[in-house]
């Protein structure tokens, strides 16, 4: 029973770390990443479709992303979707492809992005602690139902705390790596 609680705790906490890493992909670092366009939807014949599904999206260099739509009549629609997404760049439509030129990040922008990464990490830590609380509640329920003893309950809560500490540390290490990536010029 307790092994199942531990396994579920680890699984949910791992998902929190994966969600944090996915959130980090939306942050701009020193070089552009096509993930900044994730979530932008284009009206494709009446259906809202991911931008990546209507053309090829490539980072051609450290400051440029090019979008080559499968159908040229989508250029205007894609351009409008990018403008509405408020990602901090204006699309450049040359009639064949759309280019997005990202200016180099200033020190202030880098620091602001690093702060945003810290906020994301703090939210992940809150999620991890909530998972700990849910797991501890499961242990208390097992104790109340007399499925485990008082000593087993205490040991289980200690083990859950160890698991929590390891995932909080993992979140901090992930943040350190991301901050280094963001702040490196």
From Swiss-Prot:
Alphabetized Gene3D superfamilies for the sequence: 3.30.1360.40, Ribosome-recycling factor
Protein name from the UniProt record: Ribosome-recycling factor
Molecular function as annotated in GO: ribosomal large subunit binding
Coiled coil ranges: none
Keyword field contains Protein biosynthesis: yes
Entry keyword Ligase: no
GO BP terms, alphabetized: cytoplasmic translational termination
Compartment(s) of residence: Cytoplasm
Protein purpose: Responsible for the release of ribosomes from messenger RNA at the termination of protein biosynthesis. May increase the efficiency of translation by recycling ribosomes from one round of translation to another.
PANTHER family in UniProt: MITOCHONDRIAL RIBOSOME RECYCLING FACTOR PSEUDO 1, RIBOSOME RECYCLING FACTOR
UniProt keywords, alphabetically: Cytoplasm, Protein biosynthesis
Family: Belongs to the RRF family.
NCBIfam families: frr (TIGR00496)
CC terms in the record's Gene Ontology section: cytosol
């Amino acid at each position: 029973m307790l092994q199942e609680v531990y396994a579920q705790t680890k699984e949910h906490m791992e998902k929190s770390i994966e969600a944090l890493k996915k959130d980090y992909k939306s942050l701009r670092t020193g070089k552009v990443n096509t993930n900044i366009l994730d979530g932008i939807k284009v009206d494709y014949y009446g259906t809202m479709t991911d931008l990546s599904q209507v053309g090829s999206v490539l980072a051609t260099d450290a400051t440029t992303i090019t979008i080559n739509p499968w159908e040229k009549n989508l250029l205007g629609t894609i351009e409008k979707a990018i403008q509405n997404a408020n990602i901090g760049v204006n699309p450049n439509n040359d009639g064949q492809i759309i280019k997005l030129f990202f200016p180099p990040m200033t020190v202030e922008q880098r620091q602001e992005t690093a702060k945003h990464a810290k906020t994301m990490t703090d939210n992940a830590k809150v999620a991890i602690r909530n998972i700990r609380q849910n797991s501890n509640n499961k242990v208390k329920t097992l104790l109340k139902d007399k499925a485990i003893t008082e000593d087993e309950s205490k040991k289980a809560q200690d083990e859950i705390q160890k698991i929590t500490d390891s995932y909080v540390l993992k979140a901090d290490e992930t943040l350190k790596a991301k901050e280094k990536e963001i702040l490196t010029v």
